[in-house]
Curated annotation (Swiss-Prot):
The glycine cleavage system catalyzes the degradation of glycine. The H protein shuttles the methylamine group of glycine from the P protein to the T protein. It comes from the Bacteria. This is Glycine cleavage system H protein. GO terms for cellular component: cytosol; glycine cleavage complex. The keyword Flavoprotein does not apply. One of its GO terms (biological process) is glycine decarboxylation via glycine cleavage system.
Length: 129
């Protein structure tokens, strides 16, 4: 399979992507990681308004193969939750980088996106050949 690694995304070691938009962070899971999970059957996400610390779990993704937790790459308040993904988990599988985003985070302080991997660095990690 051919995966997308858009240049405007940065990635955490745990396969979450971050898109910085006007001081907010749109967070989802990479196309590569979603493909590894197989058919997604259930998505659970933290509540809007929840304040979480970097590294804390903000949700779980259940597939026919496994249940995986998703982690925040930065501390902050969840200001939006993608209810569409909860109602229709296939969105996450079919379009993880577009309609399948998970949450929008208002970081508690200025974040350095450079602390995360660039698209090229992430691609080299998950597809070393």
């Amino acid at each position: 399979m051919s995966y997308q690694f858009p240049d405007n995304l940065n990635y955490a070691d745990t396969h979450e992507y971050v898109l910085e938009e006007e001081g907010l962070l749109k967070i989802g899971v990479s196309e590569f990681a979603i493909d590894q999970l197989g058919d997604i059957v259930f998505v659970e996400l933290a509540d809007q308004g929840a304040t979480l610390e970097k590294g804390e779990t903000f949700g779980t993704i259940e597939s026919v193969k496994a249940v995986e937790e998703v982690y925040l790459p930065f501390s902050g308040e969840i200001v939006s939750v993608n209810e569409s993904v909860i109602d229709n988990p296939e969105l996450l599988q079919n379009d993880p980088i577009g309609e399948g985003w998970l949450v929008i985070l208002k970081p508690e302080s200025k974040v350095s996106i450079a602390d995360l991997m660039t698209s090229e660095e992430y691609k080299s990690k998950v597809m070393p050949n």
